[in-house]
Every structure is written in structure tokens, then in C-alpha cells.
Design a protein with these regions (language model features):
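A generic local structural motif
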Residues: 4-7, 29-31, 49-51, 103
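Extreme N-terminal tail/first-helix region
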Residues: 1-18
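Short hydrophobic-aromatic micro-motifs
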Residues: 42-45, 80, 116-118, 125
């Protein structure tokens, strides 16, 4: 495995909260989300009755920022440009279920539980602000 890929995977493992940007009415909309990963593929959960679900249905292009934890500008982070789709697999919904989601979704069997799969088109990894 290449060193940059290893660094990105390690960062994905350490940083679960990031921003997800979608497009609505030709404008970007960002929100904080809880992310999980399988290799370089990202997953995030939402309620099916949200604007982001509608945004992705209309335009699957998304942008994710992961890595920054508020400690000045010294942290590694990544910008991920990708395509989002709905993941229907009950097995993956169970695998990526997290109790922190209970505020929005009652459990992995909740019919409103929508698991979004983000397939990267490009990943830019920064070791600190201003580097690439």
C-alpha cells in the first residue's frame, strides 16, 4: 500500500466527524456528519426525510472535509470529492450503525435510516494547512 493511501486511511480511522457538502438550488450546503469508512469508501447515516437526501437524489456530487479537530492548523486533513449513492445493504447498515445516531434514527432497522455511500473521485491529503 502506498504511503499517501496509508496516511489517508489512518486519518479516516482517527477522525469520524467532518463536513458533507451537497448542492441545492445550484448552491453548496454543508453540514457536520459522522463518517465511517471501508477502505477509501466513506459512509454516513441520515434520515431519509432530510434535505441532504433530496439534494443527493437530484445531484450525487458531494464534497467531504475530514481531519481537522480544532487544534490550530497543525492537523492532517483531507478533501474528498465524490459521488454519493444510497446503500441498501442491511448488513452494511448494521455494520455502520452507531448509538450516536439515535437522536435522528431509532436503530439499524428504522425504515427512515438512510446509509449514504460516498465513492471518491479524488482525495487531496494535507499534512497541515497549506500543504498538499
Amino acid at each position: 500500500m502506498s504511503e499517501p493511501k496509508e496516511k489517508v486511511l489512518q486519518m479516516f480511522k482517527e477522525h469520524k466527524i467532518g463536513t458533507l457538502a451537497t448542492i441545492r438550488q445550484n448552491k453548496p450546503f454543508s453540514r457536520f456528519m459522522l463518517f465511517f469508512h471501508d477502505g477509501l469508501t466513506l459512509y454516513t447515516a441520515t434520515n431519509k426525510d432530510t434535505h441532504k437526501a433530496e439534494d443527493i437524489e437530484n445531484n450525487p456530487s458531494v464534497h467531504v472535509l475530514l481531519g481537522f479537530n480544532g487544534d490550530a492548523w497543525k492537523n492532517d486533513y483531507a478533501e474528498i470529492e465524490g459521488s454519493a449513492s444510497v446503500e441498501e445493504s442491511a448488513e452494511l447498515k448494521e455494520k455502520f450503525w452507531n448509538g450516536e445516531l439515535k437522536e435522528w434514527i431509532s436503530g439499524p432497522d428504522d425504515p427512515n435510516y438512510l446509509l449514504l455511500k460516498i465513492t471518491p473521485k479524488s482525495i487531496r491529503y494535507y499534512q497541515k494547512a497549506g500543504s498538499e
